Amino acid sequence: MSMRFTFWIMVGIVAISGLSQGMLLPAIAMIFEQEGVSSSINGIHATALYIGILVISPFLEKPMQKFGMKPIIVIGGFLVIISLFFFTQTFSFWVWFILRFLVGVGDHMLHVGTQTWITTTSDPSKIGRQVSIYGVFFGIGFAVGPYLASTVQYGLATPFIISTILCLIGWLLLLPTKNAFPAQDEREVKSKSSFSRYKQVVGLGWIALLGPLAYGVLEAMLNSNLPVYALRKGWSVSDVSFLLPAFAVGGIITQIPLGILSDKYGRDRILTWTFSVSTGIFLLAAVFDQYYWIVFACMLLVGMVIGSCFSLGLGFMTDLLPRHLLPAGNILSGIAFSLGSIMGPVLGGVFIEKIQYTSFFYCGYDYNGNSRNGIYGLHEESIRIKKNRK
């Protein structure tokens, strides 16, 4: 099987994974809101998926080096399929929490495997483009997810059944692909623990982790808390299901152009620009949040500007690290994303519950403004890191 064909199988699987994640967050948020669960508890429940990512992360590098990337992806995909199926068998707050946790474990295994495969097999001059295609396909799946979530009105099990079937199809397509192994420095693999390599990654490429961290906060906050805020404003389930994909669609539109621009001008410059512009867009959404179509346009624009920051951060990590550290770098990117995703729903839920007389979008404005300030010196710092590597 050709490398090119395998690449498209990988990004296709990522699209289906994105669909299941994009469905899971708003579907459960809407179900719990209709059942009278508080917004803060709803937000805490959403963190289960990302706790799963955190728990499995330290245990992926060694098996991937020993057994290859395909077994990690296959096992992760199978775990997602089984977990989604069991959502249809019961309705319980804590059982669903555990199932969300298992989906997080499986999804992260799948993503670390596919990310490592793409970043270690791609031409270095086309890393931005290839990772952007990965991001586009995940974004397409994630954008379709909320539409799938709206099928909950036909029965609680409906979105979970459809998602299970689609994940099974993607998993079966993966089985004929050939296994591949990440690049290794044999001396370091034998003499250093995984945690030593994680320390190296943080020392060389900590700046690149800001992209996945910021994306995790915003993605989880918008998909977990925005449905609650919108329903309380009196918008319908169909309105919410149409609004949520705007962020992901915006990211799809600009993902590849921003990836190509980052190959040309540097991922550090593009990341700095995205944080600055998105802060102003969130402020606009906060001022005009009583107007549905203005909010929709703002979510689309925010997605266009900052919806690529995960893939930009991943590409930036590839720029800063030697190839044998890329598996550890991809794992830490996932950890940064999951930490952000745990923070996002909790912060958003508390904001909605405690600050009831102002717009939810001020939460995004404040966070993005602080992120922008935090990376003000990013370009100069990245130059220093690159010089130290030479």
List the model feature ranges, each with a label.
Residues 71-85, 269-283:
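Structural signature of the two symmetry-related core transmembrane helices
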Residues 1-3, 181-208:
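Juxtamembrane intracellular "pre-TM" segments in multi-pass secondary transporters
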Residues 3-50, 216-229, 233:
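Helix-loop boundary and gating motifs at the non-cytosolic
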Residues 159-175, 361-376:
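Symmetry-related core transmembrane helices of the 12-TM Major Facilitator Superfamily/SLC fold
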Residues 56-68, 255-266, 352:
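Helix-to-loop junctions at the C-terminal end of transmembrane segments
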Residues 47-60, 245-257:
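Central cavity-lining transmembrane alpha-helices of secondary-active solute carriers
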Residues 94-102, 293-301:
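Paired small-residue
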Residues 101-137, 316:
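Cytoplasmic helix-loop-helix junction between adjacent transmembrane helices
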